[in-house]
């Protein structure tokens, strides 16, 4: 294990909380107080969003951050009250209370609920570090923030964590690393850092984003069960409080601040296949044939580092891939896209134009002595781009032309923590300098380490937009910081082909979802080590419900394409991937919701049921949207597992068995039939069977419903699947509801919003569990059902933009 993993904060001094404060300025949005030479600002950005900044002596307030996307907030109605003991800053939704002696800050909503209140004893402040290196002065002193834990407060979030949903009683480290292959759930910091806590107290939620890109640590009621601690090794204290009170409102406002997930190209939601590495053109063609001949849907094939010339980025190995343009064109005709890996390390080679151009333009990181910083990764000795420099990002993005001109559809950013090969130095040393270019100030690597991956992903996305302005970019990143979701989807790095890692994937993706990163996925089947048929099949049963579905494994392991282990596993993988392909209309509609509101796609049960404390520990089951509940098998040789179904009526997808929640059940989940449940009366839009997203079968869209007494709703969203016409209204969005009484069922398709017109002519309603019907009307006119068989009533409707009402007399 490298020194980076074991590193603990060394303050070398004493913590000093801020003392007596005095008001010295205020405006129509916030107030400023001074404690000696330190300035503290409290600002209302929105009725339910406050920002607090603590800036040391001589430091002007600065809030620019790679983690923040929105800086221009609309007018907020704010009132300030002042007394000798306290200042209050109130909006229509919440109040910030600023006690002056000593300075302590807390928040309360309009109902009086208190949250994010400073610890009375420790508050916030800094650690004096005498004898600091002059070169390190820009880093500043370590800073600390202590918050009181409310009675019953439970902590969640914290980004990419694998050890479970709840974080109460834990210590969290935020420092991006390339962890050792085979890490377990107890391993703390991984590839990305999102210093955001999501708290629930008595069913009410709030969030706290500690926006500091140095190494950060949280203690969430571990050392002291009555307080939480947020600290960084340098910089200022800047944090944002999201008042809630629902999880949906917290995540909505958090992603408004840090950035929404862009609408993806539709093809990126299809099944994807990767290996480190498909070594040459013929091997790639063989894999493509395997999918099409076996009838297993697939949209994307990846090229790992062996497509390059000596691992040099933005090159092709002419021996392995003599004509990449022709290969990619041929694959495109078969319905495949190709995505290529790109690492940040640039080989130091005088005969390599990418390296020499970057050197001539002074675009690389430096040593503290001003020399070009070098270290070792895949190509050997490398230089590392300074992605804090806008000129570097533009140059990097333009270099992608070598790939896009050959037809490459997306960029896979790897090794961007950044990871290094030299023993005991797993990433750039703290004193490496990022010059920042002509428009930026130089920064030490310690100041920006956690943002390096996000900045690389930003360069990739901006480059693709410049090279192909009419296409939605597809960028994958392994590393990043809060807000990475606006640049790329987050692949969670090198897992292992272990049952434990299958289980760890579920809390990992749910934690990311609560932290704003909804578009994420793990390697299906596991990356490190040999998988087996049962593990691959069970992992596929889980993987097809991820927002990102990709099978990937490392060099030297057994092949793990869906057919690698023969029957019955090939058939299980085929049918599960076919189910994902059919669910794409539902999945794409969830991406629309996520793009507009930040709502997670794969979400923990507590997101929808925060007042149900049983959901707080439901680590190994999850919701896809609010309609499907998935509970995968995560142990070998078993067919039964415990499932918790929250409030409402739920139906087993395969058998139609009905359950009234909240209820604990023992679910039967034989291989090929995972524990999958559908919320009653909630329509699921499903497409026809297809080999890839570009295939357009004649079969109509199906709205699948398991009717149950009461009312359920969902949304169907469609657009061209690529391009940016949807931003100009070229989309089709409609609400669909189902309402059931004792003898009556009503399906309503709301008016189609937007100017996009779907190509299909028909929509099919499939009402499962309906065995008899006395009559069917469509907009008050009698309508003969297609059939009542197999435990389902099927009704075919014309595709119309106007509202449609279907009545079924039971």
Question: How would you name each of these model-derived features?
Answer:
Residues 2-24, 28, 43-85:
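A low-complexity, Ser/Thr/Gly/Pro-enriched, surface-exposed linker/loop concept
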Residues 4, 55-57, 64-67, 297-573, ...:
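Aromatic- and carboxylate-enriched substrate-binding clefts and catalytic-loop regions
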Residues 34-35, 55, 76-265, 275-276, ...:
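Catalytic and substrate-binding clefts that recognize carbohydrates or anionic sugar/phosphate headgroups
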Residues 42, 196, 291, 331, ...:
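Conserved, mostly hydrophobic/aromatic
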Residues 42, 52, 88-93, 629-632, ...:
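Short, well-ordered beta-strand segments enriched in hydrophobic/aromatic residues
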Residues 62-77, 653-671, 775-797:
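Solvent-exposed beta-strand/loop surfaces of large extracellular or lumenal domains
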Residues 283-303:
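Catalytic domains of carbohydrate-active enzymes, especially glycoside hydrolases
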Residues 462-466, 470-473, 480-491, 504-508, ...:
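Catalytic core of carbohydrate-active enzymes
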